[in-house]
Amino acid sequence: EPLAKWILALNKGDILVEAKKYLNDDVLNVEAAIQGALDIIAEDIADDIKYRKFLKDMLYKGGILKTSEKKKHDDENKVYEMYYNYQEKVKTIVSHRILAINRAEKEKVINVNIEGDKDYYLQYITRGVTKNRETNLLPYIQKAVEDSYQRLLFPSIEREIRKELTEKA
């Protein structure tokens, strides 16, 4: 955690030199120390209410709910054919369509996901973490932001939105 704080403070020093200070029986090399710090930063980003609210708002306003047909499925009567390759804005999708999409997904006919402007979201979060300041640690911060978004933040917010859409329907 001290190395994560050091990175987030946007120190000017050499991260490799700094990381050596945190080697011990559990952290055997510099790469492990840096990765551990980036994991902590990623988790902090994913838990940050500001980034969660931002992403949720952006996906509600501009996100697209997309469906795609699974290669193997039992929809011989083509009940869900309309949803084999379907997309609609999250903000405009109507209740009966949400329920039909959920049924098709539950019956393993389609995959469902929400898409948005990932590059913009990553840029916003990175600017927030760096407070818009220049830093030689930017590649590390970007790696933590990307990891947080892919592994933690986006899947969590996507589930929240899908759950809320279903509850509303």
Predicted feature residues:
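Duplex nucleic acid-engaging cores and interfaces of nucleic-acid transaction enzymes
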Residues: E1-A169
